[in-house]
Amino acid sequence: MSNNTDLSPVHVIGGGLAGSEAAWQIAQAGVPVVLHEMRPVRGTDAHKTEQLAELVCSNSFRSDDAETNAVGVLHAEMRLAGSLIMACADAHQVPAGGALAVDREGFSQAVTARLEAHPLITIEREEITGLPPTEWGTTIIATGPLTAPSLAEAIAAETDADALAFFDAIAPIIHFDSINMDVCWFQSRYDKVGPGGTGKDYINCPMDEEQYEAFVAALIEGDKTDFKEWEGTPYFDGCLPIEVMAERGPETLRHGPMKPMGLTNAHNPTVKPYAVVQLRQDNALGTLYNMVGFQTKLKYGSQTGIFKMIPGLENAEFARLGGLHRNTYLNSPVLLDNVLRLKSRQTLRFAGQVTGCEGYVESSAIGLLAGRFTAAEKLSQAAVPPPPTTAFGALLGHITGGHIVTDDEPGKRSFQPMNVNFGLFPPVDVPKPEGKRLRGKEKTIAKKRALSARALADCRNWLSLY
C-alpha cells in the first residue's frame, strides 16, 4: 500500500443488493466503508423488513447454468470475484431445478450479519435526503428502483430532469439470428437516412389485413398484468401499452406504431402491406433488435404466443420481454463514464438498478464492479473495466455505452433497463467438429458454450489484474 493512499471512508447510499455488494468489495480491499440505509427510519411500500439486501419480489436468481445461460455465466464470474451476494445465495439455496433460488429471509439475514460483522464496515440507519456533501468524498449511490423522492429530486437536479426516469416503458427485444429475413426486410421509412444510418436501419415485418385483424384481436384478449399498488404509474399517450392502443379501436395500431406508409416489401414489391411491425437495432453489435412501440403489460406467456403471430417472427427468440412498471433509473450512457462515475461530478458513482440494469443478479454485479472500481481508486490503482467479452463487461457496456440512442421517437427514452443476455456479448467463432456442420439447436448450444467459455477465461484474466 503506497504512502499517499487515501483511507478516508467510502460512503455507500442504499443497502439493497448492489449497495451491500459494493460495500463488501470495498471493505475486502482494505478500505473503510459507511453504508447508509434508510430502513427502518423510512420504509418503502415494497420492503417488509429492515434487513439489508431484502428480496422484494421473487426469490430466484434465475439459471445457474454457466455453460449455456448468460445469467449463469454472470453467477460464475461473481463467484470468481468473491461476491458476498453469491456466497450468501449459495449458502441459503432452496431446490429450484436448474435455477438458483434462495430462502429469502435466511439470505438477507446472512448478508446483514456478514456486513455488520466486518471490521471496516459501519452501517448507518438514516435517510439521505439529498446528494452527499462534498466532504464525504467518494460516494456510491445504489438506491434502487424505489429511490426516496427527495433523493431522486436531488439526482434529477444534478443530472438534468430529463435524465432520470420514474418508470420503465420496455418493448420486447429479439435476437437477430432468430428473425426470418426471407419474410422481413431492411428499410427505413421513406428510406430516410438518419445520424449514422443507411436508410435501411429497421427490420420490417409485413401483415395483410387478415393477419392484422387476428393480431389486434389477440392483443385485446391476451392476459394482462396489473400494476402493483406501490407502482402507481399512470398511462400517458407517449408510452401507451400496445394492447391499450389496440383497445382504442381496430385501426389505431396501423395509424400508429404499425403504420405501413413509406415502406415497400423487398420480397414482394407490388403488394402493399396492410400493417408493418418495425424492429430497430438495439445494441452496437447488431445482435439485438427491439420491437418499436411495443411496450406492454401483457403477461410473458401471452407475449411470446402473440408476438410470434407476426410474420417473420414465428421462431423469434426473445432476449427480453416487454413491460411497464415503476423504476427510477438514469440515462446512464449519457451520464456515466465507463467505470460508472457521474461525468459531471466524478466523486459520485452509481450502482445497481438505478443505473439501468434489470434483475437481482445484474444489480449485484454492477454493485460489485462499482465497489472494485472505487477501491482501486482509493488505493491509487487504475480502475480497469472488465473486457466486453465477459458477462460483467457485456452488462457494463449496455449501461455505459453499448446501447444505441436514437432521436426518432419524440417523447420516448431510448435507453431502457436490460437483463444480461448473450445478445450483449461480442460474436464468437464457434468451433466446428471435424467433418460435421452444426445446424439448428446444436449450433445455438455450441455458440452459447463458446461465448461462456471465452467469458470465464477473460474474467479470470481480468481479475488477475486486481
From Swiss-Prot:
Q: Which GO terms describe its biological process?
A: tRNA methylation; tRNA wobble uridine modification
**Cofactor(s) required for function per UniProt:** FAD
Which GO molecular function, any one, fits this protein according to its record? flavin adenine dinucleotide binding
> Which SUPFAM superfamilies does the UniProt entry name for this protein?
FAD/NAD(P)-binding domain
For FAD, which residues are the binding ones? Answer: G14, G15, G16, L17, A18, G19
Q: Provide the family line.
A: Belongs to the MnmG family. TrmFO subfamily.
Q: What is the protein's name according to its record?
A: Methylenetetrahydrofolate--tRNA-(uracil-5-)-methyltransferase TrmFO
Q: Which organism is it from?
A: Brucella canis (strain ATCC 23365 / NCTC 10854 / RM-666)
The protein's gene is named trmFO
